[in-house]
């Protein structure tokens, strides 16, 4: 008999076989319940924005300045200055951002959690965050980790003589990892062409991914799959940086600006490096990559395996990067760790050693650095920056600010004394309110006008939904404020039914103009407000038809953006490829429609009950694209009833697929065989998936009609106001 002690508790945090193990294709609703109050240690009334406003930012920056040159024996500073390390830390915090779904980025301080804290590309950034702990500890809840990581990058640049564009706080911390799709590979840094490759065809990178390998922020610095070809690497750079919303000029500025500072680390073989933080021993207290090579730190540090210092002044802003890039010819060599890198042919030893003042080295570059010279488009920009140092400095300052603030959303979220005054197009600017707002009496009068305009409940509801549901909680973009639904590109999106939308907007514009023309004292209603108000009127009318009197909350204050304030290309990524709330799929996808619905719900910050009640309500209100009848399980469309759930759960109906792709179904009467309803996967999932069925049963019960209306109104109002950061 074994003498090994047996744990009496089988249900420990280490876990047993999970539902995901048994049913790997089961629809995952967990992403809808991340970051709840249950994981947040702060008091219920804690307001981070108010806490940050009380922060002495100048004092924090003084402490950070002092930290830069206070080298610690347990992780010594290169060149006696931590600036390069902290620039990399901030860059990698923000650099996970991707435009396709707005996920990633610096908001929330996700670099603290798995998997990001253990990505190979984030090696030894655990040390950077530990260096910051005394400062975070000192200022506590008044500055989040998310804000501190970016602020530290800014201060690092400033301490090395660079003038930054500005800094905004306002990133509240999260307390658990995001549930983000980073790829399907099972091995860190797995090369393309494998069974789980993120590439297909002619090196087409899977959407929404924005890095070339699992565990990298952008590209492989040695070149594609480690092939040291600067021209081929340029293709990867252009693709990945574009997926982070950067154009060629911003890309060149970021690479050259960032690589003006610090160095890479590859003193010895990767086999001497221990496991990443999440796999390291408990005694290491959350640190990873413990190295057995010599001292394992300082001169002996191993991070990327590359051993490159770009400039002769790695702790000062300079023009050396471009000077070296264009002044030398480059020959391929290998780092002490065996990684591909380049050294200046026949050059003098002008590069200082990071730890030995008596030593000098020849200039070195990464394969991806040389892309800025050997790619024709990048070369033109690089040479212009080389010849115009002030232009380069301005471009880097602006690109750095964009990199570190892109996922913060509108300027209304920016906090602190260093917020730049200049309004930037990528911030999706909206005019400030410049007139008296409508009051409750005006709201009632406008609702009456809208309901008398000839527009149907379905038209009012679908237009308001189309306007507001572009919002993404990931990067805080989109939403009803700005009324960009009337502008390119949104007005032309297939999901918005352009011809029908134009007719609705024309009618609402008539109501708006008549109201505004009749006012004295400058009072106005914006079209952005009126679209949402009209949707509220439609919901109230539909609830009344169901026998429930309800008032949909409404807060005026939205403004109308102009076409000139709208970056058409940047706005295009908000176009839904699927909107299960409107039973819409742009085309066939490998991902099941129900999974796309849950993804959309997560971007709208909805939980399971909110998702459920909104789908059921929007179906009976007739919000489907193209007036499709799939999922309209009611004989009284336009009435806010719980009929969707009642009829979906009716065991008198038998469902069968009627399409080859199993994405359209007929529901027939079990007794007569007569077709009663048609539905999609997005409809039937509420009867098939055990958790969603449990929610559907709540709303399909005999006593649920009033609760259903009340819950629908609450969820509807939430979506309508997701972008109202001015109300917070």
Curated annotation (Swiss-Prot):
<dbReference type="InterPro" id="IPR019794">
    <property type="entry name" value="Peroxidases_AS"/>
</dbReference>
<feature type="cross-link" description="Tryptophyl-tyrosyl-methioninium (Trp-Tyr) (with M-244)">
    <location>
        <begin position="91"/>
        <end position="218"/>
    </location>
</feature>
<protein>
    <recommendedName>
        <fullName>Catalase-peroxidase 1</fullName>
        <ecNumber>1.11.1.21</ecNumber>
    </recommendedName>
</protein>
<keyword id="KW-0575">Peroxidase</keyword>
<feature type="site" description="Transition state stabilizer">
    <location>
        <position position="88"/>
    </location>
</feature>
<dbReference type="InterPro" id="IPR002016">
    <property type="entry name" value="Haem_peroxidase"/>
</dbReference>
<comment type="similarity">
    <text>Belongs to the peroxidase family. Peroxidase/catalase subfamily.</text>
</comment>
<comment type="function">
    <text>Bifunctional enzyme with both catalase and broad-spectrum peroxidase activity.</text>
</comment>
<dbReference type="GO" id="GO:0005829">
    <property type="term" value="C:cytosol"/>
</dbReference>
<dbReference type="GO" id="GO:0070301">
    <property type="term" value="P:cellular response to hydrogen peroxide"/>
</dbReference>
<feature type="binding site" description="axial binding residue">
    <location>
        <position position="259"/>
    </location>
    <ligand>
        <name>heme b</name>
    </ligand>
</feature>
<dbReference type="GO" id="GO:0004096">
    <property type="term" value="F:catalase activity"/>
</dbReference>
<dbReference type="GO" id="GO:0020037">
    <property type="term" value="F:heme binding"/>
</dbReference>
<dbReference type="InterPro" id="IPR019793">
    <property type="entry name" value="Peroxidases_heam-ligand_BS"/>
</dbReference>
<dbReference type="GO" id="GO:0046872">
    <property type="term" value="F:metal ion binding"/>
</dbReference>
<feature type="active site" description="Proton acceptor">
    <location>
        <position position="92"/>
    </location>
</feature>
<keyword id="KW-0376">Hydrogen peroxide</keyword>
<dbReference type="Pfam" id="PF00141">
    <property type="entry name" value="peroxidase"/>
</dbReference>
<keyword id="KW-0560">Oxidoreductase</keyword>
<keyword id="KW-0349">Heme</keyword>
<dbReference type="InterPro" id="IPR000763">
    <property type="entry name" value="Catalase_peroxidase"/>
</dbReference>
<dbReference type="GO" id="GO:0042744">
    <property type="term" value="P:hydrogen peroxide catabolic process"/>
</dbReference>
<comment type="subunit">
    <text>Homodimer or homotetramer.</text>
</comment>
<keyword id="KW-0479">Metal-binding</keyword>
<dbReference type="InterPro" id="IPR010255">
    <property type="entry name" value="Haem_peroxidase_sf"/>
</dbReference>
<feature type="cross-link" description="Tryptophyl-tyrosyl-methioninium (Tyr-Met) (with W-91)">
    <location>
        <begin position="218"/>
        <end position="244"/>
    </location>
</feature>
<keyword id="KW-0408">Iron</keyword>
């Amino acid at each position: 008999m074994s003498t090994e002690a047996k744990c009496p508790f089988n249900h420990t945090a280490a876990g047993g076989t999970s539902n995901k193990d048994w049913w790997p294709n089961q629809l995952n609703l967990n992403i809808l319940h991340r970051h709840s109050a249950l994981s947040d240690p702060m008091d219920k009334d804690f307001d981070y924005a108010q806490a940050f406003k009380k922060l002495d930012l100048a004092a924090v920056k003084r402490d950070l300045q002092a930290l830069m040159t206070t080298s610690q024996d347990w992780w010594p500073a290169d060149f006696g200055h931590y600036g390069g390390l902290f620039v990399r830390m901030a860059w990698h915090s923000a650099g996970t951002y991707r435009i396709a779904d707005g996920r990633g980025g610096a908001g929330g301080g996700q670099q603290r959690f798995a998997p990001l804290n253990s990505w190979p590309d984030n090696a030894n950034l655990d040390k950077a965050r530990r260096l910051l702990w005394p400062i975070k500890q000192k200022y506590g809840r008044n500055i989040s980790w998310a804000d501190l990581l970016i602020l530290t990058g800014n201060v690092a640049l400033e301490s090395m003589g660079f003038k930054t564009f500005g800094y905004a706080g306002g990133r509240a911390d999260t307390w658990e990892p995001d549930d983000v799709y980073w790829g399907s590979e099972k091995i860190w840094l797995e090369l393309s062409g494998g069974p789980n490759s993120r590439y297909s065809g002619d090196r087409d990178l899977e959407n929404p991914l924005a890095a070339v390998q699992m565990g990298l922020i952008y590209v492989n610095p040695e070149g594609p799959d480690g092939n040291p070809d600067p021209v081929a690497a340029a293709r990867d750079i252009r693709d990945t940086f574009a997926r982070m919303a950067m154009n060629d000029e911003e890309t060149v500025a970021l690479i050259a600006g960032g690589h003006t500072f610090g160095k890479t680390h590859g003193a010895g073989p990767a086999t001497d490096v221990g496991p990443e933080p999440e796999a390291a021993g408990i005694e290491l207290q959350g640190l990873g990559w413990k190295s057995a090579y010599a001292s394992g730190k300082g001169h002996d540090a191993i991070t990327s395996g590359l051993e490159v210092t770009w400039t002769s002044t790695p702790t000062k802003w300079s023009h050396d990067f471009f000077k070296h890039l264009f002044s030398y010819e480059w020959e391929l060599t290998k780092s002490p760790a065996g990684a591909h890198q380049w050294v200046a042919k026949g050059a003098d030893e002008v590069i200082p050693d990071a730890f030995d003042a008596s030593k000098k080295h020849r200039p070195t570059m990464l394969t991806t650095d040389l892309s800025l010279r050997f790619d024709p488009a990048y070369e033109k920009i690089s040479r212009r920056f080389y010849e115009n140092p002030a232009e380069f400095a301005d471009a880097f300052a602006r690109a750095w600010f964009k990199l570190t603030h892109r996922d913060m959303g509108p300027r209304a979220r920016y906090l602190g004394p260093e917020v730049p005054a200049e309004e930037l197009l990528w911030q999706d600017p909206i005019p400030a309110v410049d007139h008296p707002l409508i009051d409750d009496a005006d709201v009632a009068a406008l609702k009456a006008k809208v309901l008398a305009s000839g527009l149907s409940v379905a038209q009012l509801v679908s237009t308001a939904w189309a306007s507001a549901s572009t919002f993404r909680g990931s990067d805080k973009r989109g939403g009803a404020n700005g009324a960009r639904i009337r502008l390119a590109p949104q007005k032309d999106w297939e999901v918005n039914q352009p011809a029908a939308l134009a007719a609705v907007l024309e009618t609402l514009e008539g109501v708006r103009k008549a109201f505004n023309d009749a006012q004295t004292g400058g009072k106005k209603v914006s079209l952005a407000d009126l679209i949402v108000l009209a949707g509220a009127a439609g919901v109230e009318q539909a609830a009344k038809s169901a026998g429930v009197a309800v008032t949909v909350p409404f807060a005026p204050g939205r403004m109308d953006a102009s076409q000139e304030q709208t970056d058409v290309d940047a706005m295009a990524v908000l176009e839904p490829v699927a909107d299960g709330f409107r039973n819409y799929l742009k085309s066939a996808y490998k991902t099941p429609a129900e999974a796309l619905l849950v993804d959309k719900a997560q971007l709208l910050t909805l939980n399971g009950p909110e998702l459920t009640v909104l789908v059921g309500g929007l179906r009976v209100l007739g919000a489907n694209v193209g007036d499709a009848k799939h999922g309209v399980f009611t004989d009284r469309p336009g009435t806010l009833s719980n009929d969707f759930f009642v009829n979906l759960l009716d065991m008198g109906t038998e469902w069968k697929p009627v399409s080859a792709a199993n994405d359209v179904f007929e529901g027939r009467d079990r007794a007569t065989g007569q077709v009663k309803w048609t539905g999609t996967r997005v409809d039937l999932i509420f009867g098939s998936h055990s958790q969603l069925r449990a929610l559907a049963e709540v709303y399909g019960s005999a006593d649920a009609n009033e609760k259903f209306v009340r819950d629908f109104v609450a969820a509807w109002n939430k979506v309508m106001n997701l972008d109202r950061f001015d109300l917070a």
